[in-house]
Regions:
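The right-handed parallel beta-helix/beta-solenoid scaffold, focusing on the short coil/turn
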Residues: 20, 55, 71, 77-79, ...
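N-terminal signal peptide c-region/cleavage motif recognized by signal peptidases
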Residues: 14-16
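N-terminal extracellular ligand-recognition/capping segment immediately after the signal peptide
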Residues: 45-48, 53-91
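Right-handed parallel beta-helix/beta-spiral solenoid domain characteristic of secreted/periplasmic
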Residues: 79-174
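Acidic, glycine- and Ser/Thr-rich low-complexity intrinsically disordered tracts
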Residues: 31, 90-99, 104-108, 168, ...
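Short glycine/acidic-rich loop motifs that flank beta-strands on beta-rich extracellular proteins
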Residues: 68-70, 91, 105-106, 111-115, ...
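Right-handed parallel beta-helix/beta-solenoid
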Residues: 18-46, 63, 451
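Right-handed parallel beta-helix
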Residues: 83, 131-145, 162-170, 194-206, ...
């Protein structure tokens, strides 16, 4: 064995030996404890403060509120977080022993500087970690009780809430503050870490912003066996923070390959809402971006306001996409939208064959429409589904009466008035219990039962 290999083996062994397991239990822990199974810490934020690169944090069941109930956690070290343990750590069943981030509106004034519930940002004054292997598994995120919803507008009679409200507007009858409007998972655009990061067996529900918005520098991002339900704008996207060497517009330098590989597999992505309640833009289940090679397969992608998969961000030659073996259903405008210069093509699954080789698409095989809707019987909330399928948006204009508009009309100037909009529903809260029923709905496709 040569000296270089010996040195590398020694370094890896030293890293593995130094990595610690830290245990956290809201009910049984204390922040002065050692962080062992027998003497766990009480709070996730305390474990993150104590942790070092390479450590694994094990979370018992409970709703973790963040430091001073700020409802976000700064992750500035290359750690892993595993949830779903019983209170005594004797077993791990994530859907039975739920490790949750479920913020309350009462604490939205304490949200601090975190842009995401999990805000990943390494110290910019230090060299970013290389060769990381960060794993996040068995976590449940729900923003449904931190949001503010209109008391009456956009409220079908059989739903719990009215339409979602973007700040500064809020429901002054029931809430203290506006919606937090934060990401669920966010990593800073200046992130320069390399290596692997993964999210598995987790649920992302009721977010008023992009649920999964991860910037990565170089390496592999994996999102597997997760449920994305009732989020706003985009369910999941990965971005590359490394610059692309270019020899001209839409012309990467010869030999260039994407620095980030993203595998998005066996996830269920439903009810991604538009940016505004006019249902006009965004509302993408999944989006690929420049600098990323995406392998999107075996997912269930449906009921998104605009499209299931969006490929319009950035030039086609600066990203690559494999879109294979997915099940699409009832996305309102299209199953895929992509740039076919100079326009945007909106395509249903039965037209995918024409898209191979277009806009960075390497492969687009074996995708299909949902054949048996019965798989979702008892899995989808029927009231929410019915209202979603029948919802309409309308607007009416009432022009101001009087001499001003009379003179404007004579001179050919725009008339003044009031526009009133109406949307039957928009981002109303989805019951978390029903979202978790989506695990295991369809054998082999989408999120499977967590074992």
């Amino acid at each position: 064995m040569n000296k270089t290999l010996l040195a590398l083996t020694a370094a890896l062994s030293a890293t593995a030996a130094s990595a610690a397991d830290i245990y956290v239990s809201l009910d049984a822990g204390k922040n002065k404890n050692a962080g062992t199974k027998e003497a766990p810490l009480k709070n996730l934020w305390k474990a993150l403060e104590n942790a070092a690169d390479g450590d694994t944090i094990h979370l018992a069941e409970g709703i973790y509120p963040g430091k001073m109930k700020q409802n976000w956690f700064k992750i500035d070290k290359a750690v892993s977080i595993l949830g779903g343990y019983s209170k005594d750590f004797s077993e791990r069943k994530p859907l039975e022993h739920r490790t949750m981030c479920q913020a309350l509106n009462d604490n939205n004034d304490k949200k601090g500087g975190g842009l995401g519930v999990f805000h990943i940002e390494f110290d910019p004054s230090q060299k970013a970690p290389d060769g990381v292997d960060m794993k996040f598994d068995g976590l449940v995120f729900d923003e449904g009780f931190a949001n503010s919803y209109h008391e009456t507008k956009g409220k079908p009679a059989d739903l719990d809430t009215g339409m979602w409200l973007e700040g500064p507007a809020y429901n002054k009858t029931k809430d203290k503050f506006a919606s937090a409007n934060r990401y669920l998972v966010y990593s800073a655009t200046q992130n320069r870490a390399t290596g692997a990061i993964s999210f598995r067996n987790s649920a992302f529900v009721n977010y008023g912003n992009i649920a999964f918005n991860l910037n990565w520098y170089k390496g592999k991002v994996t999102v597997e066996n997760c449920v994305f339900c009732n989020n706003r704008m985009i369910g999941a996207q990965v971005l590359c923070s490394a610059a692309i060497p270019m020899d001209g517009p839409n012309k990467p330098r010869a030999g260039w390959k994407p620095d980030v590989e993203w595998e998005f597999a066996n996830n269920t992505v439903l009810y991604t809402w538009s940016r505004l309640n006019d249902l006009a833009d965004m509302g993408f289940g999944i989006r690929n971006n420049t600098g990323v090679k995406a392998n999107i397969h075996d997912n269930v992608i449906g009921l998104n306001v605009l499209t299931g998969f969006d490929n319009t961000k950035g030039a086609g030659k600066t990203k690559l996409t494999n879109l294979d073996g997915n099940v699409f259903f009832l996305n309102r405008e299209s199953d895929v939208q992509m740039t076919v210069s100079p326009s945007i093509a909106k395509v249903r699954v039965d037209g995918f064959e024409d898209l191979e080789g277009t806009d960075g698409i390497e492969s687009i095989e074996d995708n299909e429409d949902l054949k048996d809707p019965a798989v979702f019987k008892g899995r989808l909330n029927p009231q929410f589904l019915n209202n979603f399928l029948t919802m309409k948006y309308s607007e009416s204009t009432k022009l101001d009466e009087g001499k001003c508009n009379g003179l404007r009309s004579v001179l050919g100037l725009p008339l003044q008035g009031t526009i009133t909009t109406k949307c039957d529903m928009f981002c109303n809260r989805y019951p978390l219990e029903d979202a978790l029923k989506l695990f295991g709905a369809m054998a082999g496709k989408g999120a499977q039962e967590i074992k």
